[in-house]
Regions:
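Non-catalytic interaction-recognition regions
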Residues: 1-141
Length: 141
């Protein structure tokens, strides 16, 4: 078991809650392992950029775009907009568990949306080896 997994699991619980450390769950590659689930979200996003030969670190000028996001995408964008407040609250209340909980919730929302792309072509990130500009901006956020 790696130190990153141990830290993530320990940080994902409030200090006033008893820590239930399940070694089997932490080794799983599933939604039951919060660290894996968050890392898998990042891996999926990175794979989209690799497939279209873009660097995830490149800046995007959003002034030239008009966006038409679905309800599901807007919900994810709202969750992303909570990040600064999550950091601030976590710091001011000395509750670091808020950060891994937030990341897990965001990853869960993203994975749900990603899986919708199997049934709805409009929700796919890459279609015919192309990606729309609004999807690029969405993923960069």
């Amino acid at each position: 078991l790696g130190k990153d997994a141990t830290r993530f699991i320990m940080l994902s619980r409030s200090s006033d809650v008893e820590l239930d450390f399940n070694f089997t769950k932490v080794k799983e590659k599933s939604k039951d392992n919060p660290l894996y689930y968050v890392q898998y979200c990042y891996a999926r996003i990175s794979s989209v950029f690799r497939n279209i030969n873009l660097d995830i670190k490149d800046k995007v000028n959003i002034k030239n775009y008009s966006f038409e996001y679905s309800k599901d995408e807007i919900n994810i964008l709202r969750k992303i907009s909570e990040w600064p407040r999550c950091i601030e609250t976590s710091s001011s209340k000395l509750e670091p568990h808020r950060i891994p909980v937030y990341l897990f919730e965001l990853a869960s929302d993203f994975h749900s949306y990603w899986n919708m792309g199997r049934e709805d072509v409009k929700k796919r990130f890459i279609d015919n080896d192309r990606i729309s500009d609004d999807k690029i901006v969405f993923l960069k956020l």
